[in-house]
């Protein structure tokens, strides 16, 4: 288990100016407020962070800005989310270059494959950047595939995955994942994307949470 990654890790909102540029002043204010509130890490370029709407150059600018503001005070997770494996690997290598603490990737989407393709996808990402802990982002509402718990635990046991960011809203499946992970020796750090019933996720066995509302008020988490 990636024990260094636990607790509250908000999915950072990327503030933009009226002209669509990164608002670095507001960004610094937001990140510093969350760090001062005691968060355990930050997740940039997730669903809340404009990742699906950012060019490669914009992604790089966002990562650089976050790394400069955070300045090593907390771990920074970087979303490397794209339609297919080679593009994800390009983002992952750039995240490594810019100082990411961990990377987060969904399964491939748009051109949908089966479980063998999904497994190979995560293996290839890990092989490309083995130094960076890799978290699987389970968000079926966006990628139209639910990641099976058995596959996730298997990849955790083999050292491919360090953890899971669960945004499936499937509380039953999450409970089974927690149980299977525990039986396997807890190879995965399990982070819930729940924010309203995050207490229930913790009681079920989550190692941490990724609550979007923490961008507004982090102390409650």
Question: Which residues make up each language-model segment?
Answer:
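Catalytic alpha/beta core domains of metabolic enzymes, predominantly
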Residues: 124, 128, 140-221
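Active-site beta->alpha loop and helix N-cap motifs at the rims of alpha/beta catalytic domains
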Residues: 2-146
